[in-house]
């Protein structure tokens, strides 16, 4: 079975309310789904005889601040039996919680924690939803587009104290004037 057959079969077999949009391309096929049907759709794709997408390759997040549901969560699946790949996408806002798929794909635990840590997307029924890449005292979610580029707190290891310390960033100046004239050029006009 080829990738297009699996995609077409899935589309014809699935309840239509589970899928908002489909996209077929040579780079891979994609289903867009509502968060309410994400778990059921993943169950179908993993367990059905003609799909067998039993490997969850990755879960990643994307932030589109101009959208009402600004966060997109992307699930990349692989069927080793049919040598086929597919993507599932769902969207959420700051308060929408997505069903955890750890019970279906145990490896999802790490990726869901990463999406929560970096974007702030929360997962219902996750067994251990805590920070994975940033420090426990870290405030905010650094891959959001509205996250400040330069923070106000510096976290560093203090060797004499033998511990991690947080302190306000010390900026020596607020504004720096750049003079683009070369210091080797004479300024009095007597060049040459």
Curated annotation (Swiss-Prot):
It catalyses: a ubiquinone + NADH + 5 H(+)(in) = a ubiquinol + NAD(+) + 4 H(+)(out). Complex I is composed of about 45 different subunits. This is a component of the iron-sulfur (IP) fragment of the enzyme. The gene is NAD9. Its main location: mitochondrion. InterPro entries: NADH_DH_suC, NADH_quin_OxRdtase_su_C/D-like, NADH_UbQ_OxRdtase_30kDa_su, NADH_UbQ_OxRdtase_CS. Belongs to the complex I 30 kDa subunit family. One of its GO terms (cellular component) is mitochondrial inner membrane. It comes from the Eukaryota. Core subunit of the mitochondrial membrane respiratory chain NADH dehydrogenase (Complex I) that is believed to belong to the minimal assembly required for catalysis. Complex I functions in the transfer of electrons from NADH to the respiratory chain. The immediate electron acceptor for the enzyme is believed to be ubiquinone. Gene3D superfamilies: NADH:ubiquinone oxidoreductase, 30kDa subunit (3.30.460.80). One of its GO terms (molecular function) is NADH dehydrogenase (ubiquinone) activity. This is NADH dehydrogenase [ubiquinone] iron-sulfur protein 3. It is a peripheral membrane protein. The keyword Coiled coil does not apply. PROSITE patterns: COMPLEX1_30K.
């Amino acid at each position: 079975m080829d990738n297009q057959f699996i995609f077409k079969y899935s589309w014809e077999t699935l309840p239509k309310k589970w899928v908002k949009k489909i996209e077929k391309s040579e780079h891979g096929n994609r289903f867009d789904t509502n968060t309410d049907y994400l778990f059921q759709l993943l169950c179908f794709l993993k367990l059905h005889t003609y799909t067998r997408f039993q490997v969850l390759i990755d879960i990643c997040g994307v932030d589109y601040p101009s959208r009402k549901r600004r966060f997109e969560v992307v699930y990349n699946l692989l069927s080793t039996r049919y040598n086929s790949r597919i993507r599932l996408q769902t969207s959420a806002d700051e308060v929408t919680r997505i069903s955890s798929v750890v019970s279906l794909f145990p490896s999802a635990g790490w990726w869901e924690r990463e999406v929560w840590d970096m974007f702030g997307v929360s997962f219902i029924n996750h067994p251990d939803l805590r920070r994975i890449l940033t420090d426990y005292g870290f405030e905010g979610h650094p891959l959001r587009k509205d996250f400040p580029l330069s923070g106000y707190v510096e976290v560093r290891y203090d060797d004499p104290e033998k511990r991690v310390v947080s302190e306000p960033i010390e900026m020596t100046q607020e504004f720096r004037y750049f003079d683009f004239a070369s210091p080797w050029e004479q300024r009095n006009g007597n060049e040459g």
